[in-house]
Amino acid sequence: QYVLIMINSIINALSNSRSNFLKVFHVLSKNKISSQDIELIEEMLVETDIGYDITNDIIDIIKEGLYDSSDLKNNIKLHLVKMLSGHQELSVKEEKTVIVVVGVNGSGKTTTAAKLAKFYSTAGKKVTLVAADTYRAAAVEQLKIWSERVGCRFIFNENSTEPASVVFNGLESAIAKDDDLVIVDTAGRLHTSENLMKELAKINRVIENRFSQFTKISLITIDASLGQNSIVQAREFGKICSMDGAVLTKLDGTAKGGVIFPLYDQLKIPVTF
């Protein structure tokens, strides 16, 4: 049930992303689907970034010709639902939790961290935001402003340029204040940057080795406009730390968003927000 709700919410979230899916189902409503229609459907599915493998699966279902238009649409929906059958809603439980937000430059990490803080604060959690992007002063200032708007605590060590040290201080502070949830905003980094990826690995080691009382959740921000390149990024980040979920950003500026399917199909990373 959650998977179906999640798929519908993403398809219906924004008009740009919804349009191609609606066009596909409109074509599928025809009594007879021509070879030209199949080519059009294939083109529209590829444009949503659903991926060539999944597009080919859907085209195969259409070519089988075993269903009338209504059953065909339902079977395609069921096929997509089945692909995400292991998809689970992100659960922040009662014990202390730290969410580490990672991703490439400009993918929306800082805004995502702020939105998560608002979401969980509204749900009754005591939240601390930690600014571990020590390279970009604007990110620190932005997160500080968001923390004031949300009404949660904000941690940044202006005397340290070491992100892992900032995270250490943030978690120690959260323990002292008995906060439920720590959200860490990390610096944007290309998955090809070896030194920055090692830095991310160090952050994870600090959390896992020094703060085992915290449940660690790693979320990767995915810029919906980047398409299939997001799969490459997520795969490389996953080599540093296991990704528990993805946050799909910038859907308002693209007709894409179908990347959620190959993201889970290939890497088993669910889109949680």
Q: Residues of each region from the PLM?
A:
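Short, Lys/Arg-enriched N-terminal segments with co-localized hydrophobic residues
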Residues: 1-5
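Generic, low-specificity signal for short hydrophobic/alpha-helical stretches with a mild N-terminal bias
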Residues: 7, 37-40, 185, 219, ...
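Surface-exposed, interaction-prone regions with an acidic/low-complexity signature
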Residues: 8-14, 241
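Primarily NTPase-proximal linker/entry elements flanking Walker-type ATP/GTP-binding cores
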Residues: 12, 16-134, 139-175, 179-184
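Conserved Walker B
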Residues: 134-135, 187, 225, 251
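Conserved catalytic-core segment of NTP-binding enzymes
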Residues: 163-176, 192-273
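Short, flexible active-site loops
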Residues: 184-190
